[in-house]
Amino acid sequence: MRKFCLLLILSLALPVFCLLQAVEPPKKEIRAVWLTTVYGLDWPHKPATTEAGRKAQQQALLDILDRLQEANFNMVFIQARLRGDVMYRSAIEPVSKTFSGKYGELPGYDPLAFVVDECHKRGMECHAWFVTFPLGTEKSVKEQGKLSVVKKETKNFAKRHNGEWYLDPGVPETADYILSLVKEIVKWL
């Protein structure tokens, strides 16, 4: 009986070991970081309202990327859509005031292009990620004025809840709207 159990275990284990040997390792290891742009959490910490501010803002990103390169990171996920605003010139949503201090204005350079170029110079991939449903507080929507999707949209897919605005994921137009942003950034790249 003992020999039978051993033979049974080996006959079951052998195919598993063979499968483990046949699995190829991934072509590359992903060592990534998410850089958040909303609320000045990761970058930028403050808007660039002057030429010196622009240079300081760009240098702050260079410092982050240099540290990531030294730590052998090979990929950056940058938050390209914040909360109803973006970090690049868009025909759909305003540029975030996080970068220049004013909605709809670039800080004298294109922040997304700058991030992508600087990542590539360091041999790192750069991927844009979006915050999809949150649009911002009542205050930020008012600051955006006519640039806000809340003011522009006519199909009622933006909803307010507890003083915050959101795209309603239960409305088909929301998916169309998000897809339009994705298509825009893909064409931009």
Residue ranges and their predicted role:
Residues 31-35, 76-78, 126-128:
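Hydrophobic faces of well-ordered beta-strands that scaffold small-molecule active sites
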Residues 15-27:
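Bacterial Sec-dependent signal peptides at the C-terminal "C-region" and cleavage site
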Residues 71-107:
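Aromatic-lined carbohydrate-binding/catalytic grooves of carbohydrate-active enzymes
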Residues 7-16:
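Bacterial N-terminal signal peptides
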Residues 56-85, 188-189:
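Catalytic domains of carbohydrate-active enzymes, especially glycoside hydrolases
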Residues 1-4:
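Positively charged n-region of N-terminal signal peptides that target proteins for export
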Residues 24, 69, 113-127:
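Surface-exposed amphipathic alpha-helices with a cationic face
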Residues 28, 36, 40-59, 117, ...:
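Active-site-adjacent "subsite" loops/lids of carbohydrate-active enzymes
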